[in-house]
Each structure stands twice: as structure tokens, then as C-alpha cells.
């Protein structure tokens, strides 16, 4: 086992605080409408230019082990805030640095760190309560657009496209962000349920222009095994032919004789049939087949529930108004399933989302909810170069998360104003314990940090602006984009309550850990000069006794 260095007390905290400052100073230059860019080196290809706090934080690894521990703890603040609220990473980092900076002065002066921590916790609880009181529900498309714009570093086009997407697919619908092909951002909306499986044979195409098979008012057969024998399918095909309606077959696979017969019948115009593979794999495939069954009002034909292909009746088949099958995707529009059944299924999946442990599972479950509930909107981000594309895409994703957070918990005045108003509301909070009161005091001072940083990045004088804002009331604040004062909500400068709350709670949590640290253990640096000399090579020809 390698030797370890153990550092105690003030020295340990001082080294950690140095690490916190290095990371926070790199991150906080991106805060506000006039935030600066940070350039990140890449091992290959062009460097990345970003104004996204969490992207900067993730890149930082310090050589000094003890400094690095401090930096990694603050990186955790940014990542955690990003995971929960999807935005507010820079605000969280600035708050954490401010609480650590103020707190370490008190600890150095001999105050008890545990009492300071209790005071910090009490102040945070009181501030969060005030933020919730000040919160206003987001109802209009305009407010949603404003939240998106602020999060995307005051880019109004991003806010507008997110608001449009939410109008189209609802606030619960899935909105994904992809690379676009043009210079402009584009919005594409997929109505109904779409899954990523296309026709099994190009002979099924009946619309050459779209290169797709379009079925109007079709039946839908859902089967969870392979179909290779046409005899199994004959009873179903006969019933569908009598009803003179098209049929979509969704099965694990359709192959051999069965596929050939379907193709021949389609070409001859005897039947209008399309076969596609079922989406997903394993258990997820079964769940998605069940989703399609509920959406179309049909049943999944599976042996475990006692259903076989030979015994299928028209009542077991799903129905839809229209189905489009392309080379890679199938879209079911206006399924005939009962609204109550669909709602019950959505509720069931939501419970699974809450219980899901991995991000991947959660994402897939959310996609299933959206496909059942509202549809999917795709925002295609346009840019001139790949470097710009990456930066823009990261901002759009941030803005999307912030907008979702605003819909969830409402909005407060942006630009650091909400925290100042909360500070004024709890200004006379006291515990009767001087050391805990010091903890409260340091948090109330630290909440000024985001506004101070926004002003500093815009080239203003932070103290002057903070005093001016504190003298105002309600949503009165400073618009750093054009150096004016006024009502923040009217100027469209809003923050989601969830983002501000999460940033404050996570910053205080990690800062408290740093302040109550009394010892640090890290691997001792290896002494390069003490390395043994390399053994000599073989002698030349003259030394070999020739």
C-alpha cells in the first residue's frame, strides 16, 4: 500500500479552500448575460468553447491532491444541481464558494464548526421557505419562453422554440435535442406513438413519394414471438380480408414462408398488410407491446395469457385511425384505446419512473409515458461549425431542463434578486446561540454572491448594485444585459424556483462538509529524484572479447 500524507486542522482546510477557489473562479466567469467563455482543451480535434458551468467544472482536475479534494467536492455541487434541476450549476458553485470563504474565516477565529453548520442549515431552511412563498406558477407560453431564454444565456430563439415544443406536445411530452442539418434551429413534432422499427420488406410500400406504407383505419395484430408459418396467420388474415380493412402485424419477427406470402398478397392487391418487428428487447419489448395494445385497444397475443394466433378474433386486434410505416420508423396516429386505460397505464409507468435506479431506465420510461400521453417533439439545433453546434446544443439542453423545472415548481425573480428578497425576509432570524447565529449571518451574506458575480462579469460595481437592489422592493432588480433597474418579471428575467432552491441547498450541504473537515488523507507524492538509475546496456563490440 502506498504511503499516505495526513494533514490536520487549519492547514487541511486552507488547502481545500484553495482548490474550491480555483474551480469556482473558473466556473463563475460564465455567470449572467455578460458571462465570459471558457475554452476547454480536447485530446483530439478542436477545443470546445463553453459558457456552461458544469462543463467547465467537469474538466478540472488539480495536481495537488488536497486542493483537488476541495475542487471535487464543489464539482459535486454543480453535478448534483444539474442532475436534480438541470440548470443553476454556476449559481450553486458561486454560493458554495461564498459560504466556504465566509465560514473558513469564522472557523479560523475559533468558532465551533458544528455550531456553524447548525446555523447554516437553519438559515437555508428559512430561505427555502421564503423562496417557495415568493414563487409564482408558470402558466403562459411567454413565461416559459422567458425562462428558456435566460437559461440559454439570453438567447431568445432558444426560449421560443422550447415554448413552441411544449405547446405542441404538452408539458409532459418528451422533447429531445438533436444535431440539425441547417444553420437555424428547427422544431419537428411527431404526433401519436412512434417507435424505431420499419417495414420488413420494401414491397409493402404503397406511397412511393414518401417511400412509406400508409394504412388508413387498420387493424393491429400484436404477437410476442416469431411468425414463420403462414398457416398460423390464415384465420386472422381471412377475418381482416372480410372486413376489407388493412392490417399491421407487429411481432418479434416475420420470416420465411409467412413473409413471402404476405408480400405476394400485397403485390397482387388481395390484402393490404404491413409487417414490422416489435420495438425494444427482452422485458422492454413486452412492456412496449403492452403499451401499443393499450393505445390501440387490442391485446398482445401471448401464450402465457392463453392466446394463440389460430384463435385470434377481430376483437383481439387493436385499431387506429392511421398508421405510417417508413424504412426506420412506424407511427401510430389516433389509436382506438380507451382514454381511462391509457391514463391508468401512464400512472403505472410514472410509479416505475420514481422507483427506477438508473438514468437510462428512467429515460426510457419517460419516453414511454410521452408516447402514450402526448407525442414527441424534436428540437434540431442548427449551427455553422461543429464547435458552435456542441456549445449551442449544451445550452438548449440546459434551457429545456430549466423550463421543465419552472413548470414543476414555478418561477421567482431572476438575476440573484429572489435570494436577496429571501435574505431580507429572514434578516432577524436568531437562535440565541452566538455561534449558530454566526452560521446564519454567513449564509445571509453569501446569498449576495450570485448578484455580485453577475454585476462583476458585466463590468459594474457589485456593492453599489447590491445596495440599490436591497433598497428596492418585490421584484425590483438589476438587468445586467442592458445595465438598467426595474421589475425583473416584467423584463422577463426569471429563474425556476426549483433551480434556485436546489443550488442553495446543495451549496450549503457541501460547504458545511468542508467547514467541518478536521483531517485529510491523501497519497504522498512520489519523489521522482530518488528513483533508481536505469541499468546499463550491453557493452559495445570492443567489450565482448572479440
Curated annotation (Swiss-Prot):
Top-level taxon in the UniProt lineage: Bacteria
Gene (name only): groEL
Species of the source: Acidovorax sp. (strain JS42)
InterPro entries for the chain: Chaperonin_Cpn60_CS, Cpn60/GroEL, Cpn60/GroEL/TCP-1, GroEL-like_apical_dom_sf, GROEL-like_equatorial_sf, TCP-1-like_intermed_sf
Top-level enzyme category: isomerase
Function: Together with its co-chaperonin GroES, plays an essential role in assisting protein folding. The GroEL-GroES system forms a nano-cage that allows encapsulation of the non-native substrate proteins and provides a physical environment optimized to promote and accelerate protein folding.
Reactions that this protein is recorded to catalyse: ATP + H2O + a folded polypeptide = ADP + phosphate + an unfolded polypeptide
Entry binding sites for ATP: 30-33, 51, 87-91, 415, 479-481, 495
Sequence similarity: Belongs to the chaperonin (HSP60) family.
Region of interest (Disordered), residue spans: 527-546
Protein name: Chaperonin GroEL
GO cellular component: cytoplasm
Subunit composition and interactions: Forms a cylinder of 14 subunits composed of two heptameric rings stacked back-to-back. Interacts with the co-chaperonin GroES.
Compositionally skewed regions (Gly residues) per UniProt: 536-546
Keyword Chaperone part of the UniProt annotation: yes
Pfam families membership: Cpn60_TCP1
Subcellular location: Cytoplasm
Transmembrane portions of the chain: none
Main location: cytoplasm
GO molecular function: ATP binding; ATP-dependent protein folding chaperone; isomerase activity; unfolded protein binding
Disulfide bonds: none
GO biological process, one term: protein refolding
EC number of the protein: 5.6.1.7
Keywords carried by this UniProt record: ATP-binding, Chaperone, Cytoplasm, Isomerase, Nucleotide-binding
Keyword Phosphoprotein annotated: no
